[in-house]
Amino acid sequence: MAHKKAGGSSRNGRDSESKRLGVKRYGGQFVLAGNIIVRQRGTEYHPGENVGIGKDHTLFALKDGTVKFLVKGAAKRRTVVIEAAQEAAAA
């Protein structure tokens, strides 16, 4: 008779690829329209002025400008806004 039971293969050794979530452009940084500001699961950050939201809750710039992170409202929601870049006056 066998002294030990046959060794099975390990059931570990698997992991999913990281999704690279998080803030991609920080407060004070200049962004172009279409730039991704935050990749997230759910609305950890909410879109504010000049910021759009994708179907996967990604926040992106709708206009060129500077990123600003705010805490707004009674619910103290973390909100991202873009302060639009001032267009140079035509001479």
Curated annotation (Swiss-Prot):
SUPFAM superfamilies tied to this protein: Ribosomal L27 protein-like (SSF110324)
Domain of life: Bacteria
Name used for this protein in its record: Large ribosomal subunit protein bL27
Keywords, in A-Z order: Ribonucleoprotein, Ribosomal protein
Cellular component annotations (GO), alphabetically ordered: cytosolic large ribosomal subunit
GO biological process: translation
UniProt similarity note: Belongs to the bacterial ribosomal protein bL27 family.
Region feature (Disordered): 1-21
An example Gene Ontology molecular-function term: structural constituent of ribosome
Species this protein is from: Azoarcus sp. (strain BH72)
